[in-house]
Amino acid sequence: MNKSRREALHSASSYIEKALDIVNDARYDEQDCIDNTPENLQSSERYEAMESAVDNLEEAADSLKEALHYIEKAVE
């Protein structure tokens, strides 16, 4: 792989790392809301939506980590 492509992929990795930080921040904030939800509201539709959001954000974070891994392997 030539230098120009490697540099472009390093740049892409930086953007993905920033995206990963944003996704993780949102996931941690949403999980904090779940953890602080009163017990009487834990059966609510909103609570279930928050749990689903956390699960989806966790999947997104895993996918971003996987993308970083494959980019790193490609640049080697």
Please identify what each model-predicted range represents.
Residues 1-76:
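Long, low-complexity or tandemly repetitive, helically biased scaffold regions used
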